[in-house]
Amino acid sequence: MAYSTYGRHITMDLREVAFEKLNDVRFLKEVMYEAAAQCGATVVGESFVQFSPQGVTGVLVLSESHLSIHTYPEEGFAAIDCYTCGYTVDPAVACDYLKAALGGRVVGYRALRRGSGAIEDLTTLHLAAANN
């Protein structure tokens, strides 16, 4: 069976997110798993770390690639990254779910197509579709 190396990669930065959400490893794990489910991804592994005095890093290893979050509660900041291989699972769905669950304001967003030659920036296309 031949496999495609085609993938989509989204990075998203959020600001003005509540400290309590960004410092709650249980909450973040729950919303990350739900984000993966919403986009149809299959979780095959995880690692979540609560830092002291604050902050969380969480990674879900997906059959289709990965979904990660790094939080800075003292700054109200979250860095989210989702890469999925193939055509079925849409990382934008996971990122949209996380934005809704966390609240805050998107201050950085990049959508890329990978694995089929040069990395292609799809950011404008995704944002235009999202605004319709």
Curated annotation (Swiss-Prot):
General function of this protein: Catalyzes the decarboxylation of S-adenosylmethionine to S-adenosylmethioninamine (dcAdoMet), the propylamine donor required for the synthesis of the polyamines spermine and spermidine from the diamine putrescine.
Modification Pyruvic acid (Ser), positions: 65
Cofactor: pyruvate
Family: Belongs to the prokaryotic AdoMetDC family. Type 1 subfamily.
Subunit structure: Heterotetramer of two alpha and two beta chains arranged as a dimer of alpha/beta heterodimers.
PANTHER family documented for this protein: S-ADENOSYLMETHIONINE DECARBOXYLASE PROENZYME
Stretches that traverse the bilayer: none
Co-factor remark: Binds 1 pyruvoyl group covalently per subunit.
GO CC, alphabetical: cytosol
Stored Pfam families: AdoMet_dc
GO MF annotations, alphabetized: adenosylmethionine decarboxylase activity
InterPro entries given in the database record: AdoMetDC_C, AdoMetDC_fam_prok, AdoMetDC_N, S-AdoMet_deCO2ase_core, S-AdoMet_deCOase_pro-enz
Post-translational modification: Is synthesized initially as an inactive proenzyme. Formation of the active enzyme involves a self-maturation process in which the active site pyruvoyl group is generated from an internal serine residue via an autocatalytic post-translational modification. Two non-identical subunits are generated from the proenzyme in this reaction, and the pyruvate is formed at the N-terminus of the alpha chain, which is derived from the carboxyl end of the proenzyme.
Record-given protein name: S-adenosylmethionine decarboxylase proenzyme
Pathway linked to the protein: Amine and polyamine biosynthesis; S-adenosylmethioninamine biosynthesis; S-adenosylmethioninamine from S-adenosyl-L-methionine: step 1/1
One GO BP: spermidine biosynthetic process
Chain positions of site Cleavage (non-hydrolytic): 64-65
